[in-house]
C-alpha cells in the first residue's frame, strides 16, 4: 500500500501520499490580520499620540499632551451589532494633560475620542451591521532607489530617487551633457551642486574634496551659477516658490520644513532601515580595490591596507570597525539649513576596469540611529556619492518589482495612517482654540474637537478602497479575502497605469506570494494572495521559512530561519524534494537549487538553506487543488478562483481526493467554531455548546470556568447564502485548544466541503456536452445532491416626509383583500408565508399633497378629528423573479428606543425570504482544475449510461475539454477518486508531493479496478454497450454562485429612462434587451422594414405611439402609424442648444411641427403602464 494514514481533526483519517515529512506546522492563516490589529492597539496608537504631542499654542504658553488611552466596553456585542446595523466598536478614552507654563498649572482630564471599531476573533470588522475586511496593501518601501535608463541616443544613464513615507521626494538625474541635476519635490531641475552648497559646502573646492574629482562633477560645477551657500539657498527658494521675494531666512526655513522637520518628513522606521542598508559601506565596497587604507578612528590602527580587494570574508572580518565609523569625517557647516555638524564615512577606491588608475570616493551615511526618522544631510551626501559611484561602475541599480523593495501595509498601519490624518486636522483646531479661549478657565475637553478624528475613521472603514465587503460565499472565500494583497488603493498603483512588469511573477515571490492565485481581467497580478507559510515582519516585508544547512557538516538542521526577499538573495536554497539520508545530508552530489532568479544545479556543499515544504510556494486556495503539478498554470488559476465561488450545499461532503489542506483552511477561515481553551464538553444542542475548561496546575488537572459557544443558525451571509453551524462534538469529549467544535457552511466533520463526489464519465452524448457543457443525471436533482439554500433580505423604512409621516399599515388603498392574505394586523407579512414575485411584504402608505377640503369633509373632520387622507401605496413587494418562504421578520421602532435608526426613520422592517434551489439547466458547475461548464441537459436516471453492475453514472463531461486545456490533474483525480470510493477511504495528495503515476495505478489495482481505469458503459436508452471503453471515476464537482435563477430575466412593461424615453437595461431595473446598431443592420439586410420600424418606435421611445398601440390592442383596433421617436427630439434639442437652427421637412418641403406632447391623457395612461419602481423613471416625474 502506497502512502500512510494521517489523522485530520477528530473525525477524519486520510491516506496521505506525501513523501516529504513536514518539519513546520502551517501558521494560523489569518494572523496577518489579527497580529497587525493587536500591534495597532498595543503600540500604533501610543506611537501616534507621541508623534503629535505636545501641541503648543503660537506663544508657547499652553501645551497639550496625550498621556495614555484605554478602550471601554463595546455598547453592543457582536451579534447585537449585526442585528441592529450598528458598528461593533468600543469607546476610546484618552488621558490628556494641559500645561499652562506661565502659572505652572497642570490640568488632566480623560477625553472621549469616539467609538473605535474592534476586530472580531476571525479578523473582520462589523461596520453598520455588515462584515468587512481590510485588505493589506503592497506599496513601494520608503528608501533610496537607483535606476538605469537608456536615453534617446542609446546611452546608458542613471537616475535616483529618495522616497519617504511622507514628505518631499528628492531625485537625481544626468543629461546628455553629463551634468548631474537634482529635483526637489517634482519641481524643475537644478544642478546637484546647488543643493550641496545650500547644505553648507560653500566653495567648489569643498565640494570636490567631499565627493572626489570626476568629470560629471566638473561639468555640474560649470553649469552651477551659484558661488556660495546664500546664493544657493536663494536659487532653491526661487525654484520652489516662484514669484515670492526670496530671503535667506525664508529659504532656510523652507528647506528645513521640506526635509528636516519631523512633522512634515517621515522616513518611518522601515525607511531608515532600508536607507541605512542601501548606503552601508558593506555592500558598496564588496569586490572593490582600496585606494586608501581603512583606519579604526578610535585607535588609529590600520585595519586594511591600501590596494586590498575586499571579498565577502574580508568584509565580514572588518564589519565591527566599519560600523564603529571607520574613516569617518565630521564637517562643521556654516550658514546652512542645519547647524549641527555632519558626520560621514569616506573611503577612496579604484574605479573598476580603468587603465589610468583613477579613484572615486565611496561615502557612507555613518549609520544614523534607527530613531532618526528624518533624512539627514549625511544621507543626502551618501546618496549623491552612490550616484557618482554608479556612473563610475560601482554599485547596483534596484529592481522595483523585487519584494525586498515592496512592503505590506496591513490593517494596523493603514488604520494608524488614517488616524494620523484625523489627529493632524484636530491639531489645527486645538491651536486655534488655544489662542481664543481664556487661559484661566480652559480645560482639555474644551480644546479638543473629536469630529475630524471620528470622520477620518468612519471614512476609512466605510469608503476606503481597501475596506471591502467580505465575500462570504464559503469558508475558503473568507480565508482568501483576509490573506489578500492589493497593489491598488490610496498611495498604490492604478489599474490603467500598471505595466506588465508589475503584474508579472517575480522570482522573489517564491514562498511569499502565490504565483497562481490572482483574478482574471484588469486586476490580474495587482491583487495577489499570501503564500501558505509566509508571514510579515515588523517592517512589513514578507518573510518565508527555510531550513538551515549546517555549514560544517552540510547536513540539514531543525533550525528554521524566516528570510525576507533581499536576505534570501545572498543564499543558495535547495528544493524541498531534495533526497536526504537519515542524518539529513544530501544524497546527491549535485543538488537542484535556486540562487536569486536562477534555477540551477550546484554542488551540495554550496547549499545554505532548504525549503520547508513543497506547498510553501502556493496560497491556501491553490494548495487545495490535488494534482496541481499536473495542471497547466492558467487552468490552475481558474481552479483556485472558482473554488471561492462554490455555493454552500445543503448536504456538504468532503472530497475523497483531498490535499490535507482542507482541515487547516476550514479551521482558520472563521466559519467554524473552535475551542478557545482545552476542556470537556458538558452540553451540546443545535444552537450552543458548553465546554468546561480543564486547567493543569502542578501536574494535576482540575476543572475551571464554563465557556459558552453560541452557534449561528440559518443566518444570511453577505453573499445571500445560508450560514449555518452544526456541532460535531459529543458530551464528554475532551477537546484541545483550537479544535473544531462545530462545522460552518461548506464543511463536513471539520474539513472544507465545497462540493460533492460524483461519478463522472468522459464521453459525448448526442452532442449535449458540446463546448464544455455538462450532462447530469436526474438523481442529483431528486436526492438534493446539489441543492443549496439562499436567504434574501428586504427592508422597508417608514420615514417622516414633508407632508407627514409614512405609515406601516394593512389599510392600503386600491388593493384587494386577496393581496393582503399574508399580512398580519400590523401590515407585515407573517413568518412561514409562501410569497411569489409581486406579493406585498410590508404594507406602507405615504401621504400625498393635501387638497382643499369640501364642506362635507370639513364636517367629518370636525366630528371625528380625522380627515379622509390622501395617501399613495408605497408597499414593499417581492421583486421580479424572487420569492420563497418568509424565514424571519425584524421590526425596529424609534419609540422603543432603537437609536441605531438613521435620522428621519420612525420604523424599519426587515423581511428575510428563504429559497431552496435545486440544480437546474443553466447553472454553472466546475471541478478543482479550472474545468468549468454549464448544465445543458438533465437526463432521467434510466437513460443515463450505466456501469456493468447497473449503477448509472451521475455526470458526463466532454473528453475534448482535457487535451487542449492541459489540466491532466482532473483525469488523475478521477481514477484515484474511484479507487478511494471502492476502498471506502479518503486520500490526501498534497501539492507537488502527492501521488505519482505508480501510486495512482497501484491504488487502482488494490481497489480491483481495470489497470487502465476504464470500463465498459451501457447506453441506458438501448441497453447496448458503447463501442469503446470509457474513463469513469469519481470527481469532486462544485456548484458555483452563477445560478440561472439569478440571471434569467424577461421584461413585460417596465420603466423608461427620463431623457431618451427608452427602456432601461439590466435585470435590477427590470430592463429590456438592447437592440444595437449591428442588430439593425441584420434587419436591414433582410429588408424587414416594418419589424425594424416597430422596434425603433413603439417598442422603444415613441411615447405617443406606445400608448396608442396599447389602446388599439385593448380595443381590438388596427395599430396606428408611429410618431416621432423621443430620441430624435432630444437630438434636435441638442443641436438647437449649439445654436443650430434645425427644421424637419417633408417631401413637399413643408416644415413638420415637432411639438412637445402635453396630452394629459397620454401621461396618465403612461403612469398606469409602469408598475415598477426603478431609478430615473418616468413615474417619478409624473408623481
Swiss-Prot record:
Instruction: List the InterPro entries.
Output: DNA-dir_RNA_pol_bsu_external_1, DNA-dir_RNA_pol_su2, DNA-dir_RNAP_su2_dom, DNA-dir_RNAP_su2_hyb_sf, RNA_pol_bsu_bac, RNA_pol_bsu_CS, RNA_pol_bsu_protrusion, RNA_pol_Rpb2_2
From the record, what ranges are coiled-coil?
A: none
Molecular function in Gene Ontology: DNA binding; DNA-directed RNA polymerase activity; ribonucleoside binding
* SUPFAM superfamilies registered for this protein in UniProt: beta and beta-prime subunits of DNA dependent RNA-polymerase
Q: What keywords tag this UniProt record? A: DNA-directed RNA polymerase, Nucleotidyltransferase, Transcription, Transferase
- What enzyme category does the UniProt record give? transferase
Q: Which PROSITE patterns match?
A: RNA_POL_BETA
Q: Which Gene Ontology cellular component terms are annotated?
A: DNA-directed RNA polymerase complex
Question: What is catalysed by this protein?
Answer: RNA(n) + a ribonucleoside 5'-triphosphate = RNA(n+1) + diphosphate
Q: What is its EC number?
A: 2.7.7.6
One GO-annotated biological process of the protein: DNA-templated transcription
| Protein purpose | DNA-dependent RNA polymerase catalyzes the transcription of DNA into RNA using the four ribonucleoside triphosphates as substrates.
In which family does this protein belong, per the annotation?
Belongs to the RNA polymerase beta chain family.
Q: Oligomeric state and partners?
A: The RNAP catalytic core consists of 2 alpha, 1 beta, 1 beta' and 1 omega subunit. When a sigma factor is associated with the core the holoenzyme is formed, which can initiate transcription.
Protein's name according to its UniProt entry: DNA-directed RNA polymerase subunit beta
> What organism does this protein naturally occur in?
Staphylococcus aureus (strain Mu50 / ATCC 700699)
Q: Gene name, please? A: rpoB
Amino acid at each position: 500500500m502506497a502512502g500512510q494514514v494521517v489523522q485530520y481533526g477528530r473525525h477524519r483519517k486520510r491516506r496521505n501520499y506525501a513523501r516529504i515529512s513536514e518539519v513546520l506546522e502551517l501558521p494560523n492563516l489569518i494572523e496577518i490580520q489579527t497580529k497587525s490589529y493587536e500591534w495597532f492597539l498595543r503600540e500604533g496608537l501610543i506611537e501616534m499620540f507621541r508623534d503629535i504631542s505636545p501641541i503648543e499654542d503660537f506663544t508657547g504658553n499652553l501645551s497639550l499632551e496625550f498621556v495614555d488611552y484605554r478602550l471601554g466596553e463595546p455598547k453592543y456585542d457582536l451579534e447585537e451589532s449585526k442585528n441592529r446595523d450598528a458598528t461593533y466598536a468600543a469607546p476610546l478614552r484618552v488621558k490628556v494633560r494641559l500645561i499652562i507654563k506661565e502659572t505652572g498649572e497642570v490640568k488632566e482630564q480623560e477625553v472621549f475620542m469616539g467609538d473605535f471599531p474592534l476586530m472580531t476573533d476571525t479578523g473582520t470588522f462589523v461596520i453598520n451591521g455588515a462584515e468587512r475586511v481590510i485588505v493589506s496593501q503592497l506599496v513601494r518601501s520608503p528608501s533610496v532607489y537607483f535606476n538605469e535608463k537608456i536615453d534617446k541616443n542609446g546611452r546608458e544613464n542613471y537616475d535616483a530617487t529618495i522616497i519617504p513615507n511622507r514628505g518631499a521626494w528628492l531625485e537625481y538625474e544626468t543629461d546628455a551633457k553629463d551634468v548631474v541635476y537634482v529635483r526637489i519635490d517634482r519641481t524643475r531641475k537644478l544642478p546637484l551642486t546647488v543643493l550641496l552648497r545650500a547644505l553648507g559646502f560653500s566653495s567648489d573646492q569643498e565640494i570636490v574634496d567631499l565627493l572626489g574629482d570626476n568629470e560629471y562633477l566638473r561639468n555640474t560645477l560649470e553649469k552651477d551659477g551659484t558661488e556660495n551657500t546664500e546664493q544657493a539657498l536663494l536659487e532653491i527658494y526661487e525654484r520652489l516658490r516662484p514669484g515670492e521675494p526670496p530671503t535667506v531666512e525664508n529659504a532656510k526655513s523652507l528647506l528645513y520644513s521640506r526635509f528636516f522637520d519631523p512633522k512634515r518628513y517621515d522616513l518611518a522606521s522601515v525607511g531608515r532601515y532600508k536607507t541605512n542598508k542601501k548606503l552601508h559601506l558593506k555592500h558598496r565596497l564588496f569586490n572593490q580595490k582600496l585606494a586608501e587604507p581603512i583606519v579604526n578612528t578610535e585607535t588609529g590602527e590600520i585595519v586594511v591596507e591600501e590596494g586590498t580587494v575586499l571579498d565577502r570574508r574580508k568584509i565580514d572580518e572588518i564589519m565591527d570597525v566599519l560600523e564603529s565609523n571607520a574613516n569617518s569625517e565630521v564637517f562643521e557647516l556654516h550658514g546652512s539649513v542645519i547647524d549641527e555638524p555632519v558626520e560621514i564615512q569616506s573611503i577612496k577606491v579604484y574605479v573598476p576596469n580603468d587603465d589610468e588608475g583613477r579613484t572615486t570616493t565611496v561615502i557612507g551615511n555613518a549609520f544614523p540611529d534607527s530613531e532618526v526618522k528624518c533624512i539627514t544631510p549625511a544621507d543626502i551626501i551618501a546618496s549623491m556619492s552612490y550616484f557618482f559611484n554608479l556612473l563610475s561602475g560601482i554599485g547596483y541599480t534596484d529592481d522595483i518589482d523585487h519584494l525586498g523593495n515592496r512592503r505590506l501595509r496591513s490593517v494596523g498601519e493603514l488604520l494608524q495612517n488614517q488616524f494620523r490624518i484625523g489627529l493632524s486636522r484636530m491639531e489645527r483646531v486645538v491651536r486655534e482654540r488655544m489662542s481664543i479661549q481664556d487661559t484661566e478657565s480652559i480645560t482639555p475637553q474644551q480644546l479638543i474637537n473629536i469630529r475630524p478624528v471620528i470622520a477620518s475613521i468612519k471614512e476609512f472603514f466605510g469608503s476606503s478602497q481597501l475596506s471591502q465587503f467580505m465575500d462570504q460565499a464559503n469558508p475558503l472565500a473568507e480565508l482568501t479575502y483576509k490573506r489578500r494583497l492589493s497593489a491598488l488603493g490610496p498611495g498604490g498603483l492604478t489599474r490603467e497605469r500598471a505595466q506588465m512588469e508589475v503584474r508579472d511573477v517575480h522570482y522573489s515571490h517564491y514562498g511569499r506570494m502565490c504565483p497562481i492565485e490572482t483574478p482574471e481581467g484588469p486586476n490580474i497580478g495587482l491583487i495577489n494572495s499570501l503564500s501558505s507559510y509566509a508571514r510579515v515582519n515588523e517592517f512589513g516585508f514578507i518573510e518565508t521559512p527555510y531550513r538551515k544547512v549546517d555549514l560544517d557538516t552540510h547536513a540539514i538542521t531543525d533550525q528554521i530561519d524566516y528570510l525576507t526577499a533581499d536576505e534570501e538573495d545572498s543564499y543558495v536554497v535547495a528544493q524541498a524534494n531534495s533526497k536526504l539520508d537519515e542524518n539529513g545530508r544530501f544524497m546527491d552530489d549535485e543538488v537542484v537549487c535556486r540562487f536569486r532568479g536562477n534555477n540551477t544545479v550546484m554542488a551540495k556543499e554550496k547549499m545554505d538553506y532548504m525549503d520547508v515544504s513543497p506547498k510553501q510556494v502556493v496560497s491556501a486556495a491553490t494548495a487545495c487543488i490535488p494534482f496541481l503539478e499536473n495542471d497547466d498554470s492558467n487552468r490552475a488559476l481558474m481552479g483556485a478562483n472558482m473554488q471561492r465561488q462554490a455555493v454552500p450545499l445543503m448536504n456538504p461532503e468532503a472530497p475523497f481526493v483531498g490535499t490535507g489542506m482542507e482541515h487547516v483552511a476550514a479551521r482558520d477561515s472563521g466559519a467554524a467554531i473552535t475551542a478557545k481553551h482545552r476542556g470537556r464538553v458538558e452540553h451540546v444542542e443545535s444552537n450552543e455548546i458548553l465546554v468546561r475548561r480543564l486547567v493543569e496546575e502542578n501536574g494535576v488537572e482540575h476543572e475551571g470556568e464554563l465557556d459558552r459557544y453560541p452557534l449561528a443558525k440559518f443566518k444570511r451571509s453577505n453573499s445571500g447564502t445560508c450560514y449555518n453551524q452544526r456541532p460535531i462534538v459529543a458530551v464528554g469529549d475532551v477537546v484541545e485548544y483550537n479544535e473544531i467544535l462545530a462545522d460552518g457552511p461548506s464543511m463536513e466533520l471539520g474539513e472544507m466541503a465545497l462540493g460533492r463526489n460524483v461519478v463522472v464519465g468522459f464521453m459525448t452524448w448526442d452532442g449535449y456536452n458540446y463546448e464544455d457543457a455538462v450532462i447530469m443525471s436526474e438523481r442529483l436533482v431528486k436526492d438534493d445532491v446539489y441543492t443549496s439554500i439562499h436567504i434574501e433580505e428586504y427592508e422597508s423604512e417608514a420615514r417622516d416626509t414633508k407632508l407627514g409621516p409614512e405609515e406601516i399599515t394593512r389599510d392600503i388603498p386600491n388593493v384587494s383583500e386577496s393581496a393582503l392574505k399574508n399580512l398580519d394586523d400590523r401590515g407585515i407579512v407573517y413568518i412561514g408565508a409562501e410569497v411569489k414575485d409581486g406579493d406585498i411584504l410590508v404594507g406602507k402608505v405615504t401621504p400625498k399633497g393635501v387638497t382643499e377640503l369640501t364642506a362635507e369633509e370639513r364636517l367629518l373632520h370636525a366630528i371625528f378629528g380625522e380627515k379622509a387622507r390622501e395617501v399613495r401605496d408605497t408597499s414593499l413587494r417581492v421583486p421580479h423573479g424572487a420569492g420563497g418562504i418568509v424565514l424571519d421578520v425584524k421590526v425596529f421602532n424609534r419609540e422603543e428606543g432603537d437609536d441605531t435608526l438613521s435620522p428621519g426613520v420612525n420604523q424599519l422592517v426587515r423581511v428575510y425570504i428563504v429559497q431552496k434551489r435545486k440544480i437546474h439547466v443553466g447553472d454553472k458547475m466546475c471541478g478543482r482544475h479550472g474545468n468549468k461548464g454549464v448544465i445543458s441537459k438533465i437526463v432521467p436516471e434510466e437513460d443515463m449510461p450505466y456501469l456493468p453492475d447497473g449503477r448509472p453514472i451521475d455526470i458526463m463531461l466532454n473528453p475534448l475539454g482535457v487535451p487542449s486545456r492541459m489540466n491532466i490533474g482532473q483525469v488523475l483525480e478521477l481514477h484515484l477518486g474511484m479507487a478511494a470510493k471502492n476502498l471506502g477511504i479518503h486520500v490526501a495528495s498534497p501539492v507537488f508531493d502527492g501521488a505519482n503515476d505508480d501510486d495512482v495505478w497501484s491504488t487502482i489495482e488494490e481497489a480491483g479496478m481495470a489497470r487502465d481505469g476504464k470500463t465498459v458503459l451501457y447506453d441506458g436508452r438501448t441497453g447496448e454497450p458503447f463501442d469503446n471503453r470509457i474513463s469513469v471515476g469519481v470527481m469532486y464537482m462544485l456548484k458555483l454562485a452563477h445560478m440561472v435563477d439569478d440571471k434569467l430575466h424577461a421584461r413585460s412593461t417596465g420603466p423608461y429612462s427620463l431623457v431618451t424615453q427608452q427602456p432601461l437595461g439590466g435585470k435590477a431595473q427590470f430592463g429590456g434587451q438592447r437592440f444595437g446598431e449591428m442588430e439593425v443592420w441584420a434587419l436591414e439586410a433582410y429588408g424587414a422594414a416594418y419589424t425594424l420600424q416597430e422596434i425603433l418606435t413603439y417598442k422603444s421611445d415613441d411615447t405617443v405611439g406606445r400608448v396608442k398601440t396599447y389602446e388599439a390592442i385593448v380595443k381590438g383596433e388596427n395599430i396606428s402609424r408611429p410618431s416621432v421617436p423621443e430620441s430624435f427630439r432630444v437630438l434636435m434639442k441638442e443641436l438647437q442648444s449649439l445654436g443650430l437652427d434645425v427644421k424637419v421637412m417633408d417631401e413637399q418641403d413643408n416644415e413638420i411641427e415637432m411639438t412637445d406632447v402635453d396630452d394629459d391623457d397620454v401621461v396618465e395612461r403612461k403612469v398606469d403602464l409602469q408598475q415598477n419602481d426603478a431609478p430615473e423613471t418616468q413615474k417619478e416625474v409624473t408623481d
